[in-house]
Amino acid sequence: MREVYIDNVSMTKFGRLDSSLRDLTTKAGEECIKNTDKKIDCLLIGAMNPEEFSSNSNISSLVADYLNIQGIPSLRIETASSSGAAIFSLGCSLISSGAYENILLVAAEKMSGLDTQKVTKILAKVIEENERLSGASMPSLAAMVTMAYKLKYKIDKELLNEIMRTIAIKNHHNGSLNPLAHFQKEISEKDYNNSKIISNPLKMYDCSPISDGATALILTSKKTDVRVSGSGQATDTVSLKNRISLSNFAATRLAAKKAYTASSLTPKDINFAEVHDAFTSFEAINTEDLGFFNEGESYLHILRGETSITGSLPINPSGGLKSRGHPVGATGLAQIIDCVYQMRNLVSHSRQVPNNQIALCHSIGGMGNNIFVNILEKASNKRSKQLLTSKINHELIPKINDSSEMINENEELEGRLASYTTLYVTPEGFDSPLTLGIIDTMKYKRIFARALFEGEFEIGGRITIFRENNIVYFRKTSYVDQIKFFARRNIKNILDFFE
C-alpha cells in the first residue's frame, strides 16, 4: 500500500451564481490542472443530483470532455451531501492500491435555478420514504435530532439558543474573512434572534444556504507537502426512527474510529477541523462524536471561544457549510480544500489557524447515514509515517426495526413522544405549519408520524397514534384533543354519507 498526497487544489466562489454547472466544473477543473506536472490518468466526479437540480446527466463523461481529457476512465460517485468526500476517499484507495498514479477529483452542484420549495423537495428524496411522505424535510429531521440532544443532556431552551447562536455568529465571522464564501458578512445577536423559525428550534441562521459551486483536487502517489494520513467511512439507517440513538450520529463515531486507527492518531492530535454544520446544532453534536469533547459538554468549549479561529481547536475556519455555503455535491471536497489552504498558509492572516500540522475533515451524507472522516497531515510533520489504511474490523451499527406499516387503518395505540418539531418551511405539496414526531410504543417500538392538531407537545409525554388514509397521525391523550378528534371524525362521516 502506497502513501497518498495532495497536489493542486482549486475552488470557485460559492453562492447564487449565474454560472452553469458546465461553467463551474470547467473553471475549477482547468484551474486545478493548468500548472501541474502530473499526468492525469483517472477522473472522479462528485455530484448529488445534477439531473434534477440543473438538468444535467452523464456528467462523468461531460466533465472529461469539458476539460479535454477524454480517453481516461471517468466515474461519478453519489453519496448524497458527502459525495465530494466520497470521491476523495475512493481516490485515495485507488492510488494507495497502485491502480492509478494521479487522479483528478471534481465535485460540484448547481442548485439556485430552482425555488426553495422545489430544492427542499429534491433534497428530501434522500429521506426514508415513509418519513418523506409524512412531510419530513432535512431541516425537520435535523430539528428532531436537536430536540433529542437537548433532552438527553438536559439543556434548557435558553442555553440551546445561546449555543446555536454562538456557532452561527462564529461561522459567519469566519465566512466574512473568506473571499470564496457564499455569505461574507457577519451577523449580530439581534440578527440571529430575529431570524424566522424554519423548524423549531432551528432558525434561518441555523441552516446552511442553497448554493452553487465547484471544487477540484489532484491526488497523487508522488510526494507533496500534504499527505492523507487516514480515511474512514461508515453508514447508518436511512430512517431516523430506526436508530438506537436520536441524539448523535453513530456513523460519525465509527468513521472517525476508522480514520484515527488508519492514521495512528487520536482526537487530541488534531489541530483544526472542518465539520459538517448543515445546521448549527450539528457542529456541537459532531465535535462530540469525533471525540474532541465529552458527550453533552461541547457547549462549554464553544461558549468559551475554544472553537474560534484563534482558539485551541478551530472548527470551521472556512465559515463551514453555514457561511461558506453548501452546494451539496461539492461540500465534502470543499472542506478538504479549505484545510489544504490552511496547511499551505494560503489564507489571509486574519483567517489563519495558529497550528496547521494536522487537520480533520468530516462530511455527512443524508441525515447522518453516509459519513466520511479524512485526516490530512503536513508531509514535513515529524512522526513515523503511516500507510493510508490499516486492518480494521468493520462493525455493524444496530437498529430498531421499521414498524410504521404494521399499524392497521383506524387502529389506535398509545406511546410516548421521543422527539418532535414544527416545520414552517415545508416541502412542495405540504401546508405550513406541519408538526412531525417520533413516538416510542410498546407494541410497535418506534413510529414516525404527523400531528393531527397543531400545538405545543412535551417530549416524553403520552401520545395516541392511528393510521388514516395510509398516513400515521398522532395526537395528545388530553380530553380536549379527544373531543376534537371525535368531532372531526363525525363530521367526516357525515360528509362521506352525503357524497
Q: What do the PLM-derived regions correspond to, one by one?
A:
Residues 1-22, 27, 124, 128-132, ...:
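Condensing-enzyme catalytic core mediating Claisen C-C bond formation in acyl metabolism
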Residues 380-423, 453, 457, 464, ...:
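OB/S1-fold single-stranded nucleic-acid-binding modules
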